[in-house]
């Protein structure tokens, strides 16, 4: 191989490597939203609705009712009524103990 052919080969290979590297970075993140290079782009462009704080608040809103230790008011009332009914049924004479 002549020197000019080697130089031409090196030039072409370096251009191909440069082009392939820049081509790999040019991904349309609107189409490939889950591509590793596109992670976080929607949050950066989206504004407040997609911010991390907004997301955490939304998660809290969705999970709080399930994580609260306090029973809903209806369940407390049903539990109280079932206790009164059990007490009534356990005393056939009709005498009932006072419940709150």
Swiss-Prot record:
Residues 44-100 form a propeptide. Disulfide bonds join 29-38. GO terms for cellular component: extracellular region. It comes from the Eukaryota. GO terms for molecular function: toxin activity. The keyword Ligase does not apply. The keyword Signal applies. Expressed by the venom duct. Residues 1-24 form the signal peptide. Keywords: Cleavage on pair of basic residues, Disulfide bond, Neurotoxin, Secreted, Signal, Toxin. Monomer. The cysteine framework is C-C. Belongs to the elevenin family. May mimic the function of prey elevenin neuropeptide. In vivo, intracranial injection in mice induces hyperactivity. This is Elevenin. It comes from Conus ammiralis.
């Amino acid at each position: 191989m002549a020197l000019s052919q080697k130089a031409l080969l090196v030039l072409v290979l370096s251009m191909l490597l440069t082009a392939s590297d820049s081509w790999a970075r040019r991904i349309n993140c609107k189409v490939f939203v889950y591509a590793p290079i596109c992670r976080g782009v929607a949050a950066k462009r989206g504004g407040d609705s997609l911010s991390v704080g907004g997301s955490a608040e939304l998660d809290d809103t969705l999970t709080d009712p399930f994580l609260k230790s306090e029973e809903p008011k209806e369940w407390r009332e049903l539990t109280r009524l079932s206790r009164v009914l059990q007490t009534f049924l356990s005393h056939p004479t009709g005498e009932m103990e006072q419940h709150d």
